[in-house]
Amino acid sequence: SPTLSEIRALADALQISVSELTRLPVPAPANGETDSTKEAVRLALMAVNHGYPGGVVLPVETLRARVTAMVGALCRCEGEREVGAALPALIQDLHTSIAAGRDVAELLKLSAWLHTQATVPWLRLAGDSLDLREQAIMLAGQAAGEHGTPAPIGLVAAAGASVALEVGAFDLAQAGLDVVTMPTNTPETMQLAGFLALRRSTVAAADRRSGDVDAPLEYAAELAARTGEGNAYGLSFGPTNVGQFRVHGLVEIGDYERAVSIAEGLNPDAQDRARQAYYWIDYGLALARLRERHDDAVRAFRRAEAISPHRVLRDPIVRDVLAVLLRHSRRGSPADHELRDMARRAGLPV
């Protein structure tokens, strides 16, 4: 399975964009109404960017409740289709309310939170072509800049780095993180500071700067020891999350045996369900690199799919790993049956 750095290197060698290598097939797997919903989100973002959001002016309390419910549903992997269906109207209503000029400071904070913790994650879940996520990051960045306080700016930096990583823009991801200084004087900002440190470690691992991986991880671990397991801003930051990012970084730099060893010492149930799904994905990616653990890799991916099908079936790296596992699978084994069923659901040739 290719790592982010390997995908970037291949794209450079072929003189194409990373997004061309990671594009989903048409029709996309696990589709339902996902593609039509993505188009509705696209139109909502376009309307806002053109200055005509076309929503309804609503009280800040109503909008806060809707944003909170949406972020919470994504953290719990509940009603992901319904979240997508509700997202365009929420984008339009929130930005229409900002334009109306009442409670603007609070609404700007909500805009940064909505786009970084709901719009971008849902679009990633849906397997978009990254341009929509970049539009959402730009809107969040504008809101955070106007608000001018550390937390919204930090949320944008973390989400922006994630999007930049996926297109192989490692320098851009690092630059966005370098300009952020996050205070740790509240439990919420302490968790956000820790999460930003985790993101810095991920960027270093993807960029093959192995000497820069451990320091931010250790800082995050220090903060996690003080915060315990938390979920400020929907980040699910805590000791387990630090361990999971450590696993992810080890997969990126190619230390698969150590990644598996650390993963097997974690308790994914200590996190929200979205992070649980990513735990099983990262664990599966590491297992898939160990020839004698392929069956375990299949079972790990199946655990992730049971929590959130889209996170497996629409993820380009996981799809590539499933295809590789298929080529090496032992016909007739229990894991082979599970693998082939999963591959069919992903739209892969079996």
Give the location of each predicted region.
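DNA major-groove recognition helix of helix-turn-helix/homeodomain DNA-binding modules
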Residues: 4-20
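Conserved binding/catalytic microenvironments
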Residues: 66-350
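TPR-adjacent "capping" and linker segments in tetratricopeptide-repeat scaffold/adaptor proteins
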Residues: 53-61
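Short C-terminal boundary/hinge segments that cap the last helix of small helical domains
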Residues: 15-30, 242
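Short, charged recognition helix plus adjacent turn
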Residues: 23-54
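Recognition helix of helix-turn-helix/homeodomain-like DNA-binding domains
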Residues: 1-2, 27
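Onset of an N-terminal alpha helix
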Residues: 38, 60-64, 336
